[in-house]
């Protein structure tokens, strides 16, 4: 008997397929077909790389499963990072798949601003009179990251920028942070505390997080050390693209952050403990110092 644990294991495989899709420049969908606890096929969408508008993850997975097993997929289940669209739901029905498991719903995507046909998989299956069980929301939090607009923008940016050109991304980020500082001077002037404390709260303000998400763990007259645990699109992008966050943060994000806090006091400095940074640690250790 299949359990939620099985569904989650299959979903993890589908998520890896979706990550491969994003690395290739496709749209970030993954699917797995399984029977009796055994994976028959796994696939991701190849619309862009194959220039094929119907090469969705579910259809690619069903085609592979049909070749690997048989045309009639009765007794099989399909696990997808995203709710199957109208076309994929039809393919699931025609292939006689018995169970559908997905993470993110069409409704979720529409709310996030994505263009989707607003017709649920459940409604399509209901109209077909097919007996197919549906389970939704499996590893939804993890699947949502695949369709987050901020993460997708960063994935596109890093995919199309050579490492030798990371300075372009750094310079763009620096300019945006300086502009943000100018646009928010009124609020910034209200920051309380000494220059170290103001710098700490300025970083939190820019990222849009609370102190509980990046608590101060050590404080002295000329240094503040805090541990960031907040949701970070850059971190998720690095995980998807297999980039080393230690390199990315050092080469791209450190100088713009330091230059930002130096607007408060030119003697302020910012760095990280690169031996203690996510995903290699549970948190990122970040350090603000005030030179004498």
What are these regions (language model features)?
Residues 1-24, 91-153:
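Zinc-dependent deaminase
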Residues 14, 18-21, 57, 61-65:
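Stable alpha-helical structural segments in soluble proteins, enriched in small hydrophobic residues
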Residues 29-37:
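Short beta-strand scaffold segments in enzyme catalytic cores
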Residues 46-60:
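A short, polar/charged loop-to-alpha-helix boundary motif
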Residues 59, 63-95, 209-218:
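Helix-adjacent hinge/juxtasegments
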Residues 152-251, 267-283, 289-292:
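N-terminal accessory segment detector
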Residues 249-261:
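A conserved amphipathic terminal alpha-helix motif
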């Amino acid at each position: 008997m299949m359990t939620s644990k099985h569904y989650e294991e299959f979903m993890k495989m589908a998520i890896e397929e979706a990550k491969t899709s994003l690395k290739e420049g496709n749209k970030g969908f993954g699917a797995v077909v399984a029977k009796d606890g055994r994976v028959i096929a796994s696939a991701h969408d190849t619309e862009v790389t194959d220039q094929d508008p119907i090469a969705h993850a579910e259809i690619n997975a069903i085609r592979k499963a049909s070749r690997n097993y048989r045309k009639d997929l009765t007794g099989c289940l399909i696990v997808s990072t995203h709710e199957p669209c109208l076309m994929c739901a039809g393919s699931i029905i025609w292939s006689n798949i018995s169970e559908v498991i997905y993470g993110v719903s069409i409704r979720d995507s529409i709310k996030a601003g994505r263009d989707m046909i607003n017709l649920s998989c459940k409604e399509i299956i209901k109209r077909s009179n097919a007996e197919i069980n549906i389970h939704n929301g499996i590893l939804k939090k993890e699947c949502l990251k695949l369709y987050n607009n901020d993460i997708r923008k960063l994935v596109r940016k890093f995919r199309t920028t050579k490492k030798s050109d990371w300075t372009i991304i750094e310079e763009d980020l620096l300019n945006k942070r300086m502009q943000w500082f100018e646009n928010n001077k009124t609020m910034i002037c209200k920051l309380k505390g000494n220059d170290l404390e103001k710098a700490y709260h300025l970083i939190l303000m820019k990222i849009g997080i609370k102190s509980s998400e990046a608590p101060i763990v050590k404080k002295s007259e000329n240094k503040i050390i805090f541990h960031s645990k907040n949701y970070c699109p850059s971190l998720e992008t690095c995980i998807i693209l297999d980039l080393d966050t230690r390199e990315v943060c050092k080469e791209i994000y450190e100088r713009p952050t330091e230059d930002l806090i130096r607007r408060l006091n030119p003697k302020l400095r910012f760095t990280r403990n690169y031996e203690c940074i996510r995903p290699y640690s549970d948190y990122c250790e970040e350090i603000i110092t005030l030179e004498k």
